[in-house]
From Swiss-Prot:
Record family assignment: Belongs to the cystatin family.
Gene Ontology CC annotations of this record: cytoplasm; extracellular space; vesicle
Taxonomy, superkingdom: Eukaryota
Expressed in which tissues: Mainly expressed in gut.
InterPro entries in the record: Cystatin_dom, Cystatin_sf, Prot_inh_cystat_CS
Cysteine pairs bridged by disulfides in the record: C84-C96, C107-C127
Leader sequence residues: 1-17
Name of the protein in its database record: Cystatin-1
Domain (Cystatin): residue spans on this chain: 20-128
Pfam families: Cystatin
């Protein structure tokens, strides 16, 4: 009986560790979640301070999420300057292609999304 309880406790612990704890951060595979790439482009488009050209997303390398009253996302991405001038156009992932020989940067974006209110907000964006 005690042995069964111990085995059950260990199995529950393993399952919780794999799924992440409620309110905790859990890894998400960005390759199977195209909505995360859309969020990455949204985050990049909002970062215009001091830029002549928008940056554009080259690759979304890592993602995690935290379920709260909505969802927090941490996205790790590679960006590079695009061909689109901030002063002349609105950002478009289709039109704002990377400049030739542009040096990529590693960035982390954090976003807060409330799907039932149709709202999303960039809460943090930093590049190395």
């Amino acid at each position: 009986m005690i042995r069964s309880a111990v085995v059950l406790t260990v199995l529950v612990g393993v399952c919780l560790a794999q799924r992440g704890f409620v309110g905790g951060w859990s890894q998400v595979d960005p390759k199977i979640r195209p909505d995360l790439l859309e969020l990455a482009h949204f985050a990049v488009a909002s970062q215009t301070a001091g830029l002549e050209y928008y940056h554009t997303v080259l690759e979304l390398t890592k993602a995690s999420q935290q379920v709260v009253a909505g969802v927090n996302y941490k996205l790790t991405l590679k960006v590079a300057p695009s061909k689109c001038k901030v002063s002349e156009t609105v950002y478009s992932k289709e039109l704002c292609q990377p400049q030739l020989n542009a040096a990529p940067k590693d960035c982390e974006a954090q976003l807060y999304v409330v799907p039932w209110r149709n709202t999303k907000e960039v809460t943090s964006f930093e590049c190395n």
